[in-house]
Amino acid sequence: NVGYSMAEYKEDTDYPSQSSALQYYGDGGLHQLYLGAGFKVLKNLSVGANISYFWGDITHTRAITFPGNSSTLPLTTITGTSIQSYKLDIGAQYTQVFGKKHEATLGIVFSPGHDLNNDSYVEDRLGNEKTGTTVNNRDTVAAFGSPMSLGVGFSYVYDKRLTVGADFTFQKWSSVTYMNEKNAFCNRTKIAVGAEFLPNPMGRSYLAHVKYRLGAYYSQPYYKINGMRAADEYGVTAGFGLPIPRTRSVLSLSAQYVRTEGKT
């Protein structure tokens, strides 16, 4: 899904009336239906694949206003894309047991990039509700693609009580064309680590079966602001897995703290 909102103020101390405020919005997302299959090819090795069909609408908005100059009209540019296409994911997983209490799993997933079927438009809005708005809406033939994606993950389980894991994701957005622009995005990377602790799987008390979870991640976004990569993102998550009595269900509760940091 696409969802962001950013603001920037450019101050001109010599000519205050030319100072400008810029706002950037992203909205929309994609829906996905998929069919998957997996096979165990060796004792500890499994492979699988998903093929999916996805569709949806995505809009990117850039708005510029001049707070100190009422005679200069604000300009809003909306770029919209309606997408219908497919996606292929191929993965493999290897699990190794060491003794009675140790288990390690390594997984990898790959998705090739390709061009997407789309209908695109660009809309320019000059003015606002007070001044009146002039709208110029035009369809455009635009190239748009999905990135090559590679993910690698590792997990370790001790005595069925402690699980720790790490994931790394790389998406080659720099090779994706957007609205016929070949250098519209940056490569995206994300690193995530986490742990889950179960006090006593064989315990009789309720608290012995509560799962305690903690995780953190660092992510570099793929989109640019004024030709530069947008702010990096950090996040920390903590939560619990609460077993529901007399069922196999678990109620998961979590909280997340997110911080962005960068020049934009």
Model-assigned labels for residue ranges:
Residues 1-264:
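Outer-membrane beta-barrel porins/channels
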